[in-house]
Amino acid sequence: MKSEVAPKDILFQTAARLFYQHGYRAIGVDTIAAESGIGKMTLYRHYPSKDNLIVAYLHDSNKLFWNNFEQITKEAPTSREKLLAFFEALQDYVLSPACYGCPFLNLATEYPEANYPGHQVAIEHKQSVRERFNQLAEEAGARQPEELANALFLLMDGAYMAARMFGSSPNSPAANVAKVARQLIDGQCGF
């Protein structure tokens, strides 16, 4: 028995791919409907507006980020090694052709207005990443955990922006993000 993908899921997957690869403002509901092969009426039945679809995509991206984070770090025995594992995986990702930057940074760039519905979702995601970095930095014995967390946060976002700007080029500024993270972590944790 063949299982079919629900139209809502097809619409969402299509929109997610298009938003990530081309941006939020560049993609309209006509493009999503055409690419998915599903009519606009069905799209609007599931997502009353493009903004609703963007917010749903951001929530899904947040869930995916944390699932990946846990998967990447679960084998690392210490908090220091969890941070290092994350940045090694980040380096691999930002240098891959599958990376188009960070969906949350991309959103904030295209919709800088604080009252935009997706803006708060992006801020909440970024704050939770900073908090997790800070927790791991404290557990790793960093002399100044908040300072380390902020530096790692900026390094991560810089790597995402480099991926968006330079693509998967080995000459990308993100090509040594894991090495720089290790220097920051080791400098703060006394290694």
Task: Give the positions of each predicted feature.
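Alpha-helical DNA-contacting segments of helix-turn-helix folds
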Residues: 54-61, 68
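Short, solvent-exposed amphipathic helices
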Residues: 71, 117-128, 132-135
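Hydrophobic alpha-helical connector segments
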Residues: 56, 70-96, 139, 149-152
